[in-house]
């Protein structure tokens, strides 16, 4: 009897343990399923958050672009309201010779003959004229590198207020990249407020229609072709800048966007020009490197430009500057020594140089230059 009771008790315990085991297994399975579902929900949530973040970043970038564009438009309108944007029609009416000179471009570029009046886009300017010196700086986008702010700071800060009043600095943005144009305008209006307000600092750009598509180096495959196109465009950029500056001042000084003007440079230039006894000079070199630091009489600029335009495809502009002497100074069959002697008399060199070249990264993509002494 007692044995049966023990067996029954064991059976009941076994059944209870089995039931508990089944229940535990069921609960564990259910919990695992819930954990799996929870994990899936977490992963899905993470994916949604990642997608949302990417979308937010994209929207933020788009909003920043729109905001920058709005800031540029606001700045432009403020300049307009402050009478800081020169009116092209007024300028052309006062300077018909300028209009006629720009019209000469149609002779060299047939694709311009269908266009109306040819004139740079004046972004910042008061149409300042009647000064002694115009200083021209052509700038293009160099990617992650820019020397323009450093250049302008040295150029304008090393003038006295009276010298600043008797001069105008012209920045030509010779780049089709609108973002670069906006960045230059923003930097100048923020950093050089006094010069902008007084009209002593101007910003102009080249209309898109001015250069034909053949000058777009992006469409050229060979590196040599791209370099040739870059040099051609550089000559044309300088020509536009010279023509624009011609009616503004008595003298024109050519600079570049990657140089530093030395202390008292402007005083030294004005003193040197004022003390030249002979008036028979062609131009004065305040730098020996390239086209930097060349001072011209503004009345001669049109003749230089026409010569450059005749041979703009053949050589860089500083080489063309040498060639013009062979045409203007040397007679056919003349002894070279006599020609060089006359050349020194009308091509005056100032030493030491008043400008230091600092740009390592050239405006030509992936080209570096380390020539410093100018």
From Swiss-Prot:
Keywords: Differentiation, Endoplasmic reticulum, Glycoprotein, Golgi apparatus, Membrane, Signal-anchor, Spermatogenesis, Transmembrane, Transmembrane helix. It holds the Pfam family MGAT4_cons. Expressed in testis. Poorly expressed in testis biopsies from men with impaired spermatogenesis. GO terms for cellular component: endoplasmic reticulum; endoplasmic reticulum membrane; endoplasmic reticulum-Golgi intermediate compartment; Golgi membrane; Golgi stack. InterPro entries: Glyco_transf_54. The keyword Endoplasmic reticulum applies. GO terms for molecular function: acetylglucosaminyltransferase activity. May play a role in male spermatogenesis. In vitro acts as inhibitor of MGAT1 activity causing cell surface proteins to carry mainly high mannose N-glycans. The function is mediated by its lumenal domain and occurs specifically in the Golgi. A catalytic glucosyltransferase activity is not detected. May be involved in regulation of Sertoli-germ cell interactions during specific stages of spermatogenesis. PANTHER family: ALPHA-1,3-MANNOSYL-GLYCOPROTEIN 4-BETA-N-ACETYLGLUCOSAMINYLTRANSFERASE-LIKE PROTEIN MGAT4D, N-ACETYLGLUCOSAMINYLTRANSFERASE VI. May self-associate; specifically in the endoplasmic reticulum prior to its translocation to the Golgi. Interacts with MGAT1, MGAT3 and MAN2A2; may interact with MGTA1 specifically in the Golgi. Belongs to the glycosyltransferase 54 family. This is Alpha-1,3-mannosyl-glycoprotein 4-beta-N-acetylglucosaminyltransferase-like protein MGAT4D. It comes from Homo sapiens. The lineage of its organism: Eukaryota, Metazoa, Chordata, Craniata, Vertebrata.
